[in-house]
Structure formats: structure tokens, C-alpha cells
Amino acid sequence: MNFLQKLEHAWATQNSLLQVGLDPDPARFPAELQGRPDAILSFCRGIVDATAPFASSFKPQIAYFAAHRAEDQLEALCGHIRDKYPHLPIVLDAKRGDIGSTAENYAREAFERYQAHAVTVSPYMGLDSVEPYLAWRDRGVIVLCRTSNPGGSDLQFLPMADGQPLYLHVAGLVADKWNAHGQCGLVVGATYPNELAAVRKRVGDSLPLLVPGIGAQGGDINATVQAGANSARAGMMINSSRAIIYASGGEDWREAAAEAARGLRDAINAVR
């Protein structure tokens, strides 16, 4: 089963488009985990176990682990998800963008060391920076397209010679040329529903969209679903991180995360 098949299976069997982002910040951990050498792993594992019934994928952000010299804990976390929830894909949020042997090693890091099912990448250096990931035919490659941050407009909205904005050129390039083996997806922020709709129209049902910006960043659930869903009323990994994993800083942090995930899943399903 390749990444897209695994993701589609998770959407259907979990009845969920929710992706839980894992962005561990030890300063925000509950008191019971403070000072523990395995605090990052323990926190993320607790969040995963609490939210797995309501999620269709998980997205660990590699920088939150690397900054605390906790790559080994990320490796253990990915192993925990694969072992306990083998039906739920892991999307490693790395946003890599180099070329040649460097990119090949980044791909090995994502797919061999962490055994992620997909990874996020930057298209700025062109196909050369994406091909090393595409060589792993059963894995997903999620390409930055129209990101949720305000500064994304500095480049992504610039007009091409034919008048279309750069982000739509990227969407077309990925859909028409880079997705020969059905491996690719796009990152498109919920904070720009008009652009999200334009991307979905451009790529049709061919690509899954990873949609950050719901929750702490203020994206609207109804607008997001109406703009980004495919013809099967799926096709999206709607990501929420902080609003779920930091729903409570007290002893009820697991239960609060579960309720936040349940509530967001249900809110998404209500407008599908």
C-alpha cells in the first residue's frame, strides 16, 4: 500500500480528515513531565494515544525535536505510531529543499531513519530538489504551494509571464509533471480559502492537500472544507497542532487533547 492508498484508507475507516500536528515545546508541558529526559517522547506519545481515535494522520515537526537534541525520541515516536496505529500515516514536516546527494540523504532520513510515510518539501530549487524523494515510490512527497503565513505572498502570489500566480504554477507543475507515480500532494493554507479553491480547481482530484492554519492560526473550518474538498468530500489533511496538543496544561492534558481532536473532527465532518 503506497502513501495515497494508506491515506485514503485512513480517511474512510477513521471517518476523519483531521491531522494532528506534533510540535512539542517542553516549556508548555504539564508539570508531571517537566525535567524528564524523555519528556518530549512521553508528551507526544500521550497525545498520539489520546487523539488516534479521531485522527487520520499525524504530522511531527522535525525542528521541535532537533532543537532539543531529541531526534532519537522522534525516531521512537514514529516507531510507536507505526506499531500501535499502523493504519495512520506519518507525515514528517521537514520542508527540505536541497539538491543532489544532500537531498538523497534528507530522503533517507525521512523514509529510512524515521520511516515516515510522507515528507514535506520546498520546490524552490525545482525538480532536482524533489526527485530524490520521488525515488521512494511508495512514499508521499508533499510540496509547499500556498502556505498559511502572511509572508508567503512575498513570493507565492507573484505573477508568472502568463498572468497566473506562482503558487498556481507550482500546483500545475506538481500535478502535471511531478506526480507521474501518484506520490505528490500540496501544502495549502486554510487562511487563504480563495487560493485553496483555486488550487483544488487546478489539480482536480489528483492530489491530496495538507491544509494547516485551522485552530490557532484562525482558518475557518467551513470555508476550508468547501474550498479544498475533492469530489468525494475528502482529499485533505486538515492539520491542527497547538489547539489540540496544548488544550490543557494541567493533569487532564490527555483528556483535553482527545476532546479537542474529537470536536474538530466532528466540526469538519458536519460541513463535509
UniProtKB/Swiss-Prot annotation:
GO terms for biological process: 'de novo' pyrimidine nucleobase biosynthetic process; 'de novo' UMP biosynthetic process. The active site is at K95. GO terms for molecular function: orotidine-5'-phosphate decarboxylase activity. Gene3D superfamilies: Aldolase class I. It catalyses: orotidine 5'-phosphate + H(+) = UMP + CO2. InterPro entries: Aldolase_TIM (IPR013785), OMPdecase_AS (IPR018089), OMPdecase_type-2 (IPR011995), OMPdeCOase_dom (IPR001754), RibuloseP-bd_barrel (IPR011060). Pathway: Pyrimidine metabolism; UMP biosynthesis via de novo pathway; UMP from orotate: step 2/2. Its EC number is 4.1.1.23. Keywords: Decarboxylase, Lyase, Pyrimidine biosynthesis. Belongs to the OMP decarboxylase family. Type 2 subfamily. This is Orotidine 5'-phosphate decarboxylase.
